[in-house]
Amino acid sequence: TGGNVEMSGSVTGNDTGIALTGAQIHAGAGKVALTGVSSSGKGIVVDSATTVDTRSVDLRTDTIDLQGTITGDGDSDGSVTVRTFTGDRIINFGTGSGGLDLAGNTFSSAGKIQGFKKNIVGDAAKKSNIKAGGVTADNNLVLSSAAGKITVSGAVTVAAGHGLTLASKDSVEGAGVITADAVNLDAADAVVRLTGTHAIQKLDGKAKELAFKNSADLVVGGETGLTIGAGGANIAVTAGDLT
């Protein structure tokens, strides 16, 4: 009914690390943290009869089956993080299988996680390779791969009024198209080559090297600045102004 909720489970074989079956968790302004590990089965299973209401949530697992709903309270400080338990794993977001697999609409009104002002996939302190395509998000979205690679293989669409942060110490690449009000690069040590023709309004952050193309007016560095390393930058717009 309120406060923080923490659960963890670790099993071998095909059993489930944490299974929420018909559970009703109401944490109010608190945080729900679930850590589930299974050597061959699912780390975390949330069945369709389960509902979780909370301000913040942290799901830490290498495999997940998410059928129930996890709902934020809409507070400006609220966030949800979905990240791997083990380092050097793959996160498939909207495309692919065989890793920590998330539906592309996970953070939208049509998905299972709703109402959080910040939606984070990955962990800034633990390497993962993130592949994203066919993704829609209703609020701010962060992809964070630490020393791993982010591949934008298909469309990544963030609702109007919100932005996408790409955080990597390795590389950010792909031909998928990003649609968002803003893109922020947390990639001072990474080569960023995004070859799709994107539909954003603002580009800020840091990258070691940058290639980026936009389909309309683009303001570069207007919010927090844009710092590019020795690799230089190639930024173009196919229509409109670059300022």
Region roles according to the model:
Residues 1-243:
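Extracellular lectin-like interaction modules
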